[in-house]
Amino acid sequence: MEVEEIYKHQEVKMQAPAFRDKKQGVSAKNQGAHDPDYENITLAFKNQDHAKGGHSRPTSQVPAQCRPPSDSTQVPCWLYRAILSLYILLALAFVLCIILSAFIMVKNAEMSKELLGFKRELWNVSNSVQACEERQKRGWDSVQQSITMVRSKIDRLETTLAGIKNIDTKVQKILEVLQKMPQSSPQ
């Protein structure tokens, strides 16, 4: 039940004993002081009279302090404060997340710039290494060609040397044959 319905229900309960008293002719002033139905009754009205154009009845102001709940359906005021505190903490956490997200985006932009710089430097180093490798390859190719040329010259020299040795042995044989022959005198 809502608060307004509870008060209307209590009002109906109060009207029944008063109606009985009027029928019996008993004064409500004399009877109401000792009747348990009339003890400690306070009514709270919403602004119904203002809507109807009537004058508002004086009602006792409810203090701003918490009072213990009289009904099990009424929520204690500390719960409202706790929920409000949780909402405030949630809002602060949300603001903190926004600030951290902005900080992360700024750092991400800075790191992107640094990474682009590193990429350019790596590209330059890669090009330099590639140029060095090409020069080294050309150098090795020229060394290989020189080695091949020297080997071919050595092979020619060896064949020439073998031919010279062969000629030398033949010349030696010819000399020996000539020395063994009698010397003819010229006449």
From Swiss-Prot:
Keyword Magnesium attached: no
Gene (name only): MCEMP1
Keyword Thylakoid listed: no
Main localization of the protein described in the UniProt heading: membrane
UniProt source species: Homo sapiens (Human)
Region: Disordered, residue numbers: 49-71
Gene Ontology terms: cellular component: plasma membrane; specific granule membrane; tertiary granule membrane
TM annotation in the entry: 86-106
Record's keyword terms, sorted: Glycoprotein, Membrane, Signal-anchor, Transmembrane, Transmembrane helix
Glycosylation sites: 124
Organism domain of life: Eukaryota
Extracellular topological intervals: 107-187
Record's subcellular location: Membrane
Membrane topology, record value: Single-pass type II membrane protein
Name the UniProt record assigns to this protein: Mast cell-expressed membrane protein 1
GO terms for MF: identical protein binding
